[in-house]
Amino acid sequence: MPRDLSRSRSPSPSPSRRRKHSRSPVRQRHSRRSRRDRSPSPYSSHSYSRRKSRSISPRRHRSRSVTPKRRSPTPKRYKRQKSRSSTPSPAKRSPAATLESAKNRNGEKLKREEEERKRRQREAELKLIEEETVKRVEEAIRKKVEESLQSEKIKMEILTLLEEGRKRLNEEVAAQLEEEKEASLIEAKEKEEREQQEKEERERIAEENLKRVEEAQRKEAMERQRKEEERYRELEELQRQKEEAMRRKKAEEEEERLKQMKLLGKNKSRPKLSFALSSK
């Protein structure tokens, strides 16, 4: 906004002052066109179409009439304008008419710039007014809230709400603690049951292992006893066979002795017989 105000206070250059610096209508026209190209205004398209429709050909002929022996500073632009224009060129204008039309265009441009400046200034003022209004409304609301908070009734209501909130919070905490206690008791009971089951399982496994060990020992003892009994029977059989052999041997020896005794007894009886015979 200060930039717009300074722009509005600064005096605008007069057409006569601009004409003093311009050397020819052709160069003045090109300089204005270059300024319009650098900073286009909201109305540039409309004004350019109007200027294009009515003043392309006259400017071309006018530039030839004013400076016939001087080459234009921008010949390419004239070539483009020449290629665009398809209508026959109207009658030539005088330099005074050209200056008058330039003055009118400058006046329109200044008028548009002034309107644009006023519009921006109004927008800036409206924005400032809106911001100031928002600040005042916020300040009024803040003061109203502070006044309401300072009243005794509001204080009591706030204290009541705080007390209710504290009570509700205590109840929620107590309920949560009770739930956690019950959950911990249930967990401890489940843990005890699991430990008891694990203990019983371990005892059962130990008892089964003991039974298997005892069974293995019993089987081993029975097998050992069976082997000992077999060995004992074998020893008895060997003893019996040995005794039987000894009895047979003894019987054979007795029989042999008897045979010898018989033989000896026969031998003793023969000489007596022979002697008896001889004594006769």
Swiss-Prot record:
Q: Where is the composition biased (Basic residues)?
A: 16-36, 48-83
Any S-S bridges, and between which cysteines?
none
The signal peptide here is none
Disordered: annotated span: 1-124, 177-280
Biased composition (Basic and acidic residues) is annotated at 102-124, 182-259
- Alphabetical list of PANTHER family matching this protein: ARGININE AND GLUTAMATE-RICH PROTEIN 1 (PTHR31711:SF1)
Q: What is this protein called?
A: Uncharacterized protein At1g10890
Species this protein is from:
Arabidopsis thaliana
Q: What is the lineage of its organism?
A: Eukaryota, Viridiplantae, Streptophyta, Embryophyta, Tracheophyta
